[in-house]
Amino acid sequence: MKKPKVIITRRLQDRVEKRMKELFNVDLSSAEYPISKQELLSAVKDAEILVPTIGDKIDASILSAASPKLKLIANYGAGYDHIDIKTALQRGIIVTNTPSVLTTDTADMTMALILAIPRKLREGHEEMQSGNWKGWSPSAMIGMRITGK
């Protein structure tokens, strides 16, 4: 059975790329950043499935250049406002995303910031890295206590 042609617009985690290559005929960008519009226009000409990320603007011009075989845009991320959903649906292209994928990650980062910012962790780290730290003192890098707040 012929494997569907999948265009992946930028590098993903190794395990994801490996699995995709097992299941599909994959054309994988080696870039760690969004590909150019010209590269995207060229890539979609023979795609059956497109796997973009938030940095890839999938507008009407991209969808118009796409192969009639393009049936799925599997967005690698939660947001999808970079994809022209209306035009995709008019062309019979299903658009999916990964809702809630970042919910716990966002909560983790929020907790890290709640602890790091008032306690001046970034400033302390920079002082250590630059070699300017002179040692502990009663008033250095005290920051703000968050207990009870």
Regions found by a protein language model. Give the residues of each.
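An N-terminal-biased, well-structured beta-alpha scaffold segment characteristic
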Residues: 1-96
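Phosphate-binding beta-alpha-beta segment of Rossmann-like dinucleotide-binding domains, i.e.
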Residues: 91, 99-149
